[in-house]
Each structure stands twice: as structure tokens, then as C-alpha cells.
Amino acid sequence: MGRLPEHQDSAYLRVLAIYPQAKVTHRLDMATSGLLIFAKHRDAEVAMSKLFQARQVTKHYIALVQGQIPLQGSVDVPLITDWPNRPKQMVSFEHGKTAKTLFERINYNAETNISRVKLTPITGRSHQLRVHMAHIGHPIMGDELYHPEPKRFTLPRMALHASYLAFQQPLTRQNIELDLPASF
């Protein structure tokens, strides 16, 4: 949420209208679609935050990336804020924080030279998936920050979608799996 009029509408504000005590448990980049978890109260927020910190929440994203990405692999390069170019992040082996992403190609379209890929972040750095894909030469289609030609893509937004979350509900211990297919 920000002060500008375009920042006065958000998923969080919409949830607050229904659950006034709701708390944010994690975030998505503004251009990323998909699943979000909100806690109904402070105790649930604290418990969910602990699950995220302990990496006990499984997250998968679906993305369309430029080029034919390998069938599977990982990107394990440290990230840091690119201060002169905020909000951009960048790879820094000297000063960056550990960041790891697993990827698995779902399919490749030779006509468009675009791969559909499942991304699994092991860590949770800002813009991690976006920077990692660009770093290995497969930027996410429509990414205004990290794709050298973001307008080359026909969708009106970035092709990155939080499609899957799984965790043990911290208060009831019920196993929860949420799946929301990408619209692209």
C-alpha cells in the first residue's frame, strides 16, 4: 500500500473489508498473480510467519520464460538490492544473500521460443525468481524490470503466477494444499 491513488487498491485492503483483524503473512510482487495467504488474527499471523521462516511452506510458481530452458535445474546465486536502481535486485557474489530456485520445464513452444516452467523458490528473496531466470538467460516474459524486451510479449502483464501452496495449518495441524492454475 502506498500514498499514490494507484496503490489504494490491494488484496490486503479487500481482505480487511471482510476481516478487519487480518494480517499479511507473505507477499507477492505487484505484477505477480496467484495465491496469497492472510491470517485472520495476530496469533495465526505469528504462526504462519514461523512456517515461512522455517521454510515449511511449499511454493510453486508457473512462468513463461524466453528460450528453451533445460528440462530441470537450479539457480543458486546470491542476491542484493541494486540501490541506485531500486526496486531492482541483482546478483552479488560478494555482498548478496543466499538465494536458490529450482526449475522444471513443463513444455517448450519452438514457434514462439517460449518455455512454460515450474519454479520452486527454496529461499524467499525479493524478485528472486525474476532475477534468477534473467541471470540464466531465460527472463520471464513481460517482466518490465528484468526482461530486455518486456513489450515483446502479448499478455498485458508479466507471466509469473503463484500456483501452489502447501503447509500444515499451524493451529489445527490440518494439511492444507492450495492449487490455482495460471491463466496463461
Label the model's feature ranges.
Residues 1-184:
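RNA pseudouridine synthases
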